[in-house]
Amino acid sequence: MAGLGFWGHPAGPLLLLLLLVLPPRALPEGPLVFVALVFRHGDRAPLASYPMDPHKEVASTLWPRGLGQLTTEGVRQQLELGRFLRSRYEAFLSPEYRREEVYIRSTDFDRTLESAQANLAGLFPEAAPGSPEARWRPIPVHTVPVAEDKLLRFPMRSCPRYHELLREATEAAEYQEALEGWTGFLSRLENFTGLSLVGEPLRRAWKVLDTLMCQQAHGLPLPAWASPDVLRTLAQISALDIGAHVGPPRAAEKAQLTGGILLNAILANFSRVQRLGLPLKMVMYSAHDSTLLALQGALGLYDGHTPPYAACLGFEFRKHLGNPAKDGGNVTVSLFYRNDSAHLPLPLSLPGCPAPCPLGRFYQLTAPARPPAHGVSCHGPYEAAIPPAPVVPLLAGAVAVLVALSLGLGLLAWRPGCLRALGGPV
């Protein structure tokens, strides 16, 4: 007797439903072809003090390099991260730094620029300071002024649309209910700190937590009122504030104005490397907890915790070993998150796509969080509409010349971003 077939089987409809609902199976991993890394700077001094801080009068002694500056511990953390990256990519990267293989960009802050340099000293020890003079060589770290940085420092403070979205989140019933429950706590904290906290942006409370945590990490005694319960409550308040910035409502639109910009740049850089056959293997971004939080929000991976110092989120692009036509392309994307040097990095999966995720599926799932082709508000007239810059300056320059010959120099003059593209990856 002939078989019932899929549709004739009593369980057929249920099996079809499971096939539609369950995420696709994971694909086998293949050889590595490109890596993008986004990491937070290392340990730093507090960003600020507060009026009743018992250590305020000796701050210049405690933090001789100044508030917000990288500490010796921060340098050590970044050296360790660089050594971890060297061990992870030993067979992928050349043993010595090659400008055509690795590109590094940082925000224009001392702590992130120094963190990038310390990281590179661990990643390329042959070129690190302290090596024999004949072998030591500095490695360039690229940056742009803070006011012009829309890739790693997002225009949240100056973006009216983002403020509308944030106001919608902070006026939501759930947010207001949580805030009301902390009114008494914040009022008591005002008496201990000398700060106005009730009715003020929650970032003020976060700054108190940041100062206390920095002091505690460096062995300084905390005031009696700063109990573990107080620190825990401050962390919960901080998580509520972060959630309003990167989470629902309208999380995807927030991402288009923040972390989706960086996500788009990472994907665009890989696309150009593949399309033009460029030798670039790795792009590194030295930035802040806010950068990582926004990127986690764009990926749907924010877990309610602030990234620790030297936390690193990695994107690994691989040629996969399956059937490209069947599995949605010949490249996969895997994510990892290193947030604790004592443990192996955590493999992450994009919601809806187990790792390694086919690149086409990755593009599809992240599309709502990335800026649309026509651009978004709060960005310049050209930057949002022009594809991110080509990577590797010399080869990109050759491509730009060919474009100029075929399209005419007038087009490049009309689109100044194309000329800016000669500076390297975004």
From Swiss-Prot:
For this UniProt entry, what's an example GO CC term? glutamatergic synapse
Residues in the Cytoplasmic compartment per record: 415-426
Q: How is it modified after translation?
A: Glycosylated.
EC number, as in UniProt: 3.1.3.2
InterPro entries assigned: Acid_Pase_AS, His_Pase_clade-2, His_PPase_superfam, Histidine_acid_phosphatase
Cysteine-cysteine disulfides: 159-378, 214-312, 353-357
Q: Where in the cell is it found?
A: Membrane
Q: Transmembrane segments in this chain: where?
A: 394-414
Query: Hey, which stretches end up on the Extracellular side?
Result: 27-393
Q: What Gene Ontology molecular-function terms does this entry list? A: acid phosphatase activity; protein tyrosine phosphatase activity; receptor tyrosine kinase binding
Q: In which tissues is it expressed?
A: Expressed mainly in the testis. Also expressed in the brain where they are enriched at the postsynaptic sites. Expressed at lower levels in the trachea, prostate, bone marrow, spinal cord, colon, fetal brain, heart, thymus, fetal liver, spleen, leukocytes, ovary, small intestine, pancreas and skeletal muscle. Expression is significantly lower in testicular cancer tissues than in normal testicular tissues. Isoform 3 is expressed in the testis, trachea, prostate and bone marrow.
Q: Top EC class per UniProt? A: hydrolase
Instruction: Identify the stretch annotated as signal peptide in this record.
Output: 1-26
- The source's domain of life comes to Eukaryota
Has the keyword DNA repair been applied to this entry? no
Which disease does the record tie it to?
Amelogenesis imperfecta 1J: A form of amelogenesis imperfecta, a disorder characterized by defective enamel formation. The enamel may be hypoplastic, hypomineralized or both, and affected teeth may be discoloured, sensitive or prone to disintegration. AI1J is an autosomal recessive form characterized by hypoplastic enamel, enamel discolorization ranging from yellow to black, and normal dentin.
For this chain, the family text in UniProt reads: Belongs to the histidine acid phosphatase family.
Subunit structure, interactors included: Homodimer.
Q: What is this protein called?
A: Testicular acid phosphatase
Query: What's the source species for this entry?
Result: Homo sapiens
Read off the lineage from the record: Eukaryota, Metazoa, Chordata, Craniata, Vertebrata
Encoding gene (name): ACP4
